[in-house]
Amino acid sequence: MSAFTPASEVLLRHSDDFEQSRILFAGDLQDDLPALFECAASRAHTQQFHHWQVLSRQMGDNVRFSLVAQASDVADCDTLIYYWPKNKPEAQFQLMNILSLMPSGSDVFVVGENRSGVRSAEQMLADYAPLNKVDSARRCGLYHGRLEKQPQFSLESWWAEYNIDGLTIKTLPGVFSRDGLDVGSQLLLSTLTPHTKGKVLDVGCGAGVLSAALASHSPKARLTLCDVSAPAVEASRATLAANGLEGEVFASNVFSEVKGRFDMIISNPPFHDGMQTSLDAAQTLIRGAVRHLNSGGELRIVANAFLPYPKILDETFGFHEVIAQTGRFKVYRTVMTRQAKK
C-alpha cells in the first residue's frame, strides 16, 4: 500500500464532510487512507492479513484483522466507509456483519470501482440503509445512506460446502473457488502422488482442498496451511475438522509468519489483489521458498500458462519442469539444490 487508490481519491474529494465523523473503515482496504484520513476518530476492520500488517503500523489497536467484526470494533463509530470488493457475496457478508453492530442513524458510505459491481450495493442495502449516489469520478461510484434498520447476522448461516472424492470442503464468502474445485487446483491435485511423507506447507490454502486431498492419501504427511484471508483460514480449519484431518492453520502474508523448513511447498498462488493484477505474492512465494525448503525439498505450484513464472523459477532455483498442463494452466515443479539462491 502506498499511493491512494481511485476509490480513496474519490473519498478525498469529500474530506471536509468527515471532519467531525467517527469512522469505521472496512472492505477492500487497498491503501493507508484509514490511517491518514482527517476525522474525529478512525478505526478499521479487515479480513486481509496483509492489509492489517500495513495499517497496524500506523493505527495500532484501532485496526483489527478477523473473520467477523465485533461490537468493540465499531465502538463509538457513527460512520461506515466501506470499500466494495470484487466479490459480491463477500461484500454482503461483511456489510450484514458490520451493519448489525452499527447504531441506527449511522452514516453509511460505499465506494468502489464501477467494474467491481459497486452499483449493486443499492439493491443489497435497500432494506437497511437506502443509498443514493453522491459522486462519480475515476471510474468509481460513491454512495451514501443512513442506517434505518440493523440486519440480522449469524455466521453459521454463511457456511457452505461441497464434496470431492469423498472429502467435505467447507467454504465461506470471499474464499477462492467457494462454489467448487477450480480447474487449476484440480490439475495440481492430479500430480500429487500417494504416500507423500514429511512436512508439507500449503501457501494460499483457500478452503484447504489441496491439503485435505493430499492428507487423504498420504496420512504421514504433516500439514501446515496459511493464507492472507481470514475466511480462508477459518474455512481450511473447518475442512480439516470435517474430514478428521490434522494440520496447523494460520494467517500469513506468504511466508511472513511461517517458521522452519519443509519437504514440500504446494500452492495455487493468486495473481490478483482485489481488482488489481498483482504477481507480488507469487514472486514472494517462489523467491522465498528457498528459505523454507529442506535440501531436496520441492516447490510445486499451478498457474495460468501466460504468467511469467518459469523465468522467476529459473532465476531462483536454476531450473524448473512442467509436470502437467492444459491449454490454460501449467503445474511447475522445482527442487531445492545447492544452486538455488538462498
Swiss-Prot record:
It catalyses: guanosine(1207) in 16S rRNA + S-adenosyl-L-methionine = N(2)-methylguanosine(1207) in 16S rRNA + S-adenosyl-L-homocysteine + H(+). Its EC number is 2.1.1.172. Gene3D superfamilies: Vaccinia Virus protein VP39 (3.40.50.150). InterPro entries: DNA_methylase_N6_adenine_CS, Mtase_sm_N, rRNA_ssu_MeTfrase_C, RsmC/RlmG, SAM-dependent_MTases_sf, Small_mtfrase_dom. It is an enzyme of class 2 (transferase). Keywords: Cytoplasm, Methyltransferase, rRNA processing, S-adenosyl-L-methionine, Transferase. PANTHER family: RIBOSOMAL RNA SMALL SUBUNIT METHYLTRANSFERASE C. Specifically methylates the guanine in position 1207 of 16S rRNA in the 30S particle. Monomer. This is Ribosomal RNA small subunit methyltransferase C. The lineage of its organism: Bacteria, Pseudomonadati, Pseudomonadota, Gammaproteobacteria, Enterobacterales.
